Amino acid sequence: MFGISSGQIFLCFHIAAVTVCAIRVLYRQRNTGTAFAWLMVLFVFPLFGVAAYLLVGEARLGMARAKRVEQMNAFYRQFAERHFQHEDLDTDNKMRRRYQGIANVAASVTGLAASNNNAMQLLTQTDEILEAMLADIQSARQTCALAFYIIEPQGRIQTLLAAVRDAAQRGVECTILADAVGSRAFFGSEWEDNLKAAGVRIVPALPVGVLKTFFSRSDLRNHRKILIVDNLVAYTGSFNLIDPRHFKQDAGVGEWVDMMMRCHGTAVLEMAAVFYADVAVEADEHLAEVRQEIEKLDDKIPELLALKRQSGTAVAQVIPSAPDQSDPVIYETIVCAIHAAKTRVTITTPYFVPDELLLTALTTAAKRGVDVVLILPEKVDSFLVRWASRAYYPKLLAAGVKIALFHGGLLHAKTLVVDGDYALFGTVNMDMRSFFLNLEISLAIYDRDTTKQICNLQRDYLKNSSYIAIKSWQQRSKLR
């Protein structure tokens, strides 16, 4: 009727779609390189680019979930303001001034400040990790909360799951939050059925499906590892619920090498807040259940905090990150910590694929005289990550960064130590997925005594590693 062909209508819609996507790229993409790449794809391959951006261009977790997350964050901020007294959070006399700003960066996003009454025990061997966790679960009287990316019910993990089952049968309130993709071997197994039959609440984190793909991204995962018993003791670190003697034995990388921190103090309540918020967002549509549970604790909180003030003197801060946060808080914390370094930065990570900002932080630190050491596994279980990591070696080595390859298995521990008096560890790999896409958790340590434990662990890793010589690596690259 208007003399407009169907082709012209399609062209107009297509131009509009590309324009809208391009505007969203400019406003929503945090990383400049990523934004530029998306713009190139949109304008060079417009049809494919629009479809791809709608599917994976943004870290979408769904509108309903995003609303619940916002409500839970507001609720926990009020909870912290009501219960955490100034004396618990007064760290000025115990924290070096140059780290106070770094702590504020995280607190401004998460609402969780550093606390000064924590006790930390570093566990570095699978046997001692499992034995400690098992003992705490067996002694649980009120609650037992587990959140893990991978739960693989084989070997010694079956003993731990049996302890959770037994705890539920004697009246302990037990909840397991497991990533729907990472723990696919657990879901649908006999262990899931047995635990449910015993009264354990099992919640899949970020479930996937064809229809869900249109509303949220299926590649966003809950990568956190947390165990909390009676709100008095908590664990976090790199350890999944896997038995290294059975897990990925055909990958050719050796057994996974992990660490966990066993914690007492205010940090335990902060980890509990993260856990129950995750459960509520996944399983409590109107957030009524979790509010009721936390309100039940109101009378108990003063007693719990009184116990926690007697726990220890370590200054620690729980830092959770998620793609729906206003800023990539753990990523920003890492970059700030590296820039604050004066003498030494030591990092262990299984997967190292930095962006330009992190790469620049490492290379400029080395150039200004900081001893920068990366401890990476000699072999990893991802072909693409292995070659992507190696692409950065020449620039790092040329700047003076030392790269040590660990020979004792797949080094899965994620640690960062600055100048021997600041440490960051937890679930975060040094790659873009951990920084911008996954739900992660880290623990920042601001005192020398606790940090020394992690320094000693890093030294042990170095004893089983060999440094890459820049000349031999350059020659190797030329030959290839």
Which residues does each predicted region cover?
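Helical hairpin unit composed of two closely spaced alpha helices linked by a short loop
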Residues: 341, 351-373, 377, 382
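Catalytic-core elements of nucleic-acid end-processing and repair enzymes
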Residues: 414
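Active-site-proximal loop->helix
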Residues: 386-387
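N-terminal localization/anchoring segments of enzymes in phospholipid and broader phosphate metabolism
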Residues: 1-332, 336, 340, 364, ...
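Active-site donor-binding acidic/aromatic loop of nucleotide-activated sugar
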Residues: 403-407
